[in-house]
Amino acid sequence: MINIRPDEISSIIREQIEKYDQDVKVDNIGTVLQVGDGIARVYGLDQVMSGELLEFEDKTIGIALNLENDNVGVVLMGTGRQILEGSTVKATGRIAQIPVGDEFLGRVVSPLGVAIDGKGEIVTSDSRLLEAMAPGIISRKSVCEPLQTGITSIDAMIPIGRGQRELIIGDRQTGKTSIAVDTIINQQTEDVICVYVGVGQKASTIAQVVNVLEEKNAMSYTIVVASSANDPATLQYIAPYAGAALAEYFMYKGKATLIVYDDLTKQAVAYRQMSLLLRRPPGREAYPGDVFYLHSRLLERAAKLSDKLGGGSMTALPIIETQASDVSAYIPTNVISITDGQIFLSNDLFNSGIRPAINVGISVSRVGSAAQTKAMKKVAGKLKLELAQFAELEAFSQFASDLDEATQKQLARGTRLREVLKQPQNSPLSVAQQVALIYTGINGYLDDLPVSNVKSYCASLMTYLTTSKKPYTEIVRTTNQFTEEAESSLKEAILESKEAFSKTN
């Protein structure tokens, strides 16, 4: 008979108990009740958070938006064609995030951070929440540095500062995207990281923007986030937040960033579609009640950070499309009230050949003037008033037959100033060039030239300033001030180039 030793058995059992490691994994799992139109109703997800990512059986990802008594309303980030009624859904425990990093520069990505430009996968270790909190009051600093757009009429009359939110608003086909793209191109020498977000655009339009940026060597400091018109509404809704997260990554590293949302009208339409399908009560123009918050929480993320946080900035240029120039519609008035000013583009001006077609009368920048360079402030101080008076006089002069000499002079100068401010697409100007053009126009040096010759003379003046080695350009470029020396140098250049121009024309 075997001699059993109880103490040995008990020590073996004790050892086994100590070694026993039960790895319990608890998954929050639900069942699909109904699916269709990019929306799924899920039963059984009791522990789910608002905004949490959910994974379906076919690996489609969804976001939990509606938390109701007996089910959860989920918006799908895909077609959802493989999702069946009764299939299981797993809560991931994660809120929507996007990978971020320097590796994204020069790339075209989807709102989920996946490369769609055929240049290979983007590998990065950092990520940021799509819906990050905007910087608080203490974290901010007032706007104090200029963001040069390279467009004379904007930099002179509607100046934009780093950390500002300036709305670009106008009807379709009035040059809204062109202004934004020109601003990105102009950042080549400014050390500004740019993010272009295309929301609900045609794929061909986004490709065109990318081609222009590549031609102008601007893609090296630009990220394009693209959600085209055939993407699900969910992707169009999150695209601006994805762009903001990418820009924030650079902003918190102390860099200056510029983000363009093209355009927020389409994001609002996508959000309306999702909300109506989720059976949320509709409000004005069938938009849900929180459509203001949709845009305010996005645009509040643009800021000029305090020196303690690195002094980075994020300048936002949201674009809104109006119908028949109606700026009093719901979405335009919402975004106008959130932003720090607006650039209004007029259909009539565009069709009459004035491009960029900026309506100076109702365009305004509420904080940018504090950031305007001293050189520009000194020269362009009277420009906006002069053009506003000219527009008024021009309207009255259509009814009056005989005008006094002073009025005729003012009309003649206004016409020439308007010519000076016309600018071809994708050809931004430096501050020194802009100051020279405005100085020439506002001080009457163009009054004796025929209107048809103004553009060609301005081009010859720019060439003369570049080739004649006048100290003017260097003074303005290095000091950002229009000193007496710079002024006398510019006067000489104007008179000399005018003399040469009159001989050839």
UniProtKB/Swiss-Prot annotation:
Matching SUPFAM superfamilies: C-terminal domain of alpha and beta subunits of F1 ATP synthase, N-terminal domain of alpha and beta subunits of F1 ATP synthase, P-loop containing nucleoside triphosphate hydrolases
InterPro entries: ATP_synth_asu-like_sf (IPR023366), ATP_synth_asu_C (IPR000793), ATP_synth_asu_C_sf (IPR038376), ATP_synth_F1_a_nt-bd_dom (IPR033732), ATP_synth_F1_asu (IPR005294), ATPase_a/bsu_AS (IPR020003), ATPase_F1/V1/A1_a/bsu_N (IPR004100), ATPase_F1/V1/A1_a/bsu_N_sf (IPR036121)
Compartment annotation: Plastid, Chloroplast thylakoid membrane
Quaternary structure and interacting proteins, as annotated: F-type ATPases have 2 components, CF(1) - the catalytic core - and CF(0) - the membrane proton channel. CF(1) has five subunits: alpha(3), beta(3), gamma(1), delta(1), epsilon(1). CF(0) has four main subunits: a, b, b' and c.
Entry-linked PANTHER family: ATP SYNTHASE SUBUNIT ALPHA, MITOCHONDRIAL
NCBIfam families: atpA, PRK13343.1
Identification of the protein by name: ATP synthase subunit alpha, chloroplastic
Gene name per UniProt: atpA
